[in-house]
Each structure stands twice: as structure tokens, then as C-alpha cells.
């Protein structure tokens, strides 16, 4: 199914540790020194809202205008932080798709836990990873549809044997797609129909299609 022109979807992946604080954070806020280990001082860790609560606010204002998507009290939340203490990132000001850095058990075709489109000026803690850096929201929405396909999750399952989604390695068998209006896939269709287009594009046999359709749960 894969050929010499194959390009992996992981080219669009931004890992769980790619959002970081600036180097001078603890010069600006010396009172925060010692709250986190020296090796993780710039990390926007999964528990950063509890570790450094002074930096984060429940709603945006003129200064605190960057959202950080994370978890608090076992729920997904967005907290707001000053732009001046967040390092530059390729998709901070772009549309992207966020999904958990860990999910499930590694079983082939398992459902991915509630991926979503991330708006510009929203980053994330180490709980999440992201795909893409789009000026056009529609392209991010189409990438989200691709992530929900049975085809993609089957290809992901060929390498993913644990709960971890964050490494490029586990995504290396997933082919990249064109999410623009020039794509050979009609992304405006239902996810079920998109799967049928992908089966045809990659010349899957009827046995392969039957396997995917019987083993892989649909995602809404």
C-alpha cells in the first residue's frame, strides 16, 4: 500500500513538550524558583496549573491573552497566560488539531479521546500533542476528520503498541494528505465516505477493507 512517494503524517506533528516558557521566566518571577525540577523549568508540564498557579488566569485580559489547554481537577480547561513568557512556537498563532499525548492501550483501531481544533493563540500542556499549523480553519477541520477515519487509526495501530501517541515513530505509517481545496480527497463528505475514498486511493483489497470495517470502531 505504501510506495516510494509516501510521505508520513508525522511531518505535521508537534510533540507534547514543544510549548515552553521563555528562558528568563525565573528572572522575571524569582519567587517561583524551586517549584519545579531544574531540568523542567521551561516545560509547560501536565500539572503546571497547580505548580505555578500565579501565572495562569481563568479568563483572558489585555495582558493574559494566550490560552493554554490542559487539565485541572480531571477536566479539560483553558487557562490564560501572558504572551511575553511563552516561547515562540510554529502553530501558536495558527489553527491546529489537539489530541491527548496518551490514549487507550495500543489496540489497533481504538478510538482517540476527543481530538479537537485548536484556535490561534492557544497552546497546550504536556498532556497534549498537536498536528498542523494552518492559516485556514477549514484545513484544520479536515485534518480532524482524517484523524477520525478508520483508515488512519488502522495505520496508527500498526506501530502504536502502548497508550502513547506522542512520538513520531508511532505515526510513521500514516500517510500525509492534502487538506486544501485542491486535495484528491473530498473532505466535505462524511467520515464514512472519506474512509471509502482512502480505501480506493491506496488500493486496499476487499479483505483489507472488511478487516478494517469489522475491527475498527467509528468515531463521530
Range-by-range predicted roles:
Residues 1-125, 134-185, 189-206:
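C-terminal substrate-recognition regions of SAM-dependent nucleic acid methyltransferases
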Residues 128:
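Short hydrophobic/aromatic beta-strand or adjacent loop that forms the aromatic wall/cage
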Residues 207-220:
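Short, amphipathic C-terminal "tail helix"
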Amino acid at each position: 500500500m505504501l510506495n516510494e512517494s509516501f510521505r508520513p503524517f508525522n511531518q505535521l506533528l508537534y510533540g507534547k513538550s514543544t510549548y515552553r516558557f521563555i528562558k528568563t521566566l525565573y528572572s522575571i518571577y524569582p519567587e517561583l524558583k524551586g517549584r519545579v525540577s531544574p531540568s523542567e523549568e521551561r516545560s509547560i508540564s501536565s500539572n503546571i496549573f497547580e505548580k505555578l498557579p500565579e501565572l495562569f488566569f481563568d479568563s483572558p485580559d489585555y495582558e493574559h491573552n494566550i490560552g493554554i489547554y490542559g487539565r485541572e481537577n480531571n477536566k479539560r480547561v483553558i487557562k490564560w497566560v501572558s504572551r511575553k513568557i511563552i516561547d515562540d512556537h510554529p502553530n501558536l498563532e495558527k489553527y491546529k488539531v489537539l489530541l491527548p499525548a496518551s490514549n487507550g492501550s495500543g489496540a489497533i483501531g481504538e478510538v482517540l479521546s476527543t481530538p479537537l481544533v485548536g484556535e490561534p493563540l492557544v497552546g497546550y500542556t504536556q498532556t497534549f500533542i498537536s498536528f498542523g499549523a494552518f492559516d485556514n480553519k477549514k484545513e484544520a477541520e479536515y485534518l480532524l476528520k482524517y484523524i477520525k477515519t478508520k483508515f488512519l487509526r488502522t495505520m496508527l495501530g500498526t506501530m502504536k503498541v502502548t497508550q502513547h501517541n506522542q512520538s513520531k515513530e508511532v505515526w510513521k505509517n500514516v500517510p500525509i494528505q492534502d487538506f486544501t481545496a485542491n486535495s484528491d480527497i473530498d473532505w466535505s463528505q462524511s467520515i464514512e465516505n472519506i474512509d471509502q475514498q482512502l480505501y480506493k486511493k491506496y488500493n486496499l483489497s476487499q479483505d483489507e477493507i472488511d478487516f478494517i470495517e469489522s475491527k475498527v470502531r467509528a468515531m463521530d
